[in-house]
Amino acid sequence: LGAKYVLKNRSDLRIYKEFSFEYLKSLLGAYPVLGTKVPLKGRIVTFVGATGQLFLPYWLQDFLYFGYTDDIINLFDIKQNERDIANAPAYFKREYKYCTGEDMCREVVPEIYITKMFLSKYINIDDSVKGFWECIKNYFMIVDWEDLSAVLFKYDSYNRNDGDTNGILNWKESHRMISHSICVSIINGYLKYGDWMEKERFNYILHGKKE
């Protein structure tokens, strides 16, 4: 493509903070890739999620990806998913009386599919939080919405943006998002994995109610 870096984002996503591109490039310099099994020039940068994804393996948001051009091309050089699901929320409401984080991981929603298919080209992955965190530590970086003054039209967030968030941070389990600070804590080894984390996705109720 002739460009060293590329930012891939949704067409309804707006970034308003000046020098955002310089900030994203600086993250690649400050946090080099730690692992050697996945051939990346630098980390792949994604946004913090709209729901708590800290314990949902391989759920990295697809609102935005930033990195070296060759790395982002490689990220999307994966087999196309042939499932005929036009509307994921409608599908889950139809198929599940209540939907848990485990259901979302088992069904492999698009964001998870991209991450898992990319990584599985180079390493054996399982659906464990431990493996997920190891990949975050080695290959990814998360930025917060306010880092880029980002606003997303989806979820009517233009009408609910308060200047610091993009309007979506009131979602369930928002306290368990993989924020930038959480990501850095994982990378630097201060946030420690525990076996109890593997069961947490069963407690995420993303819609419906247990009877």
Located regions from the model:
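ER/Golgi luminal nucleotide-sugar-dependent glycosyltransferases, focusing on the catalytic module
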Residues: 1-9, 13-211
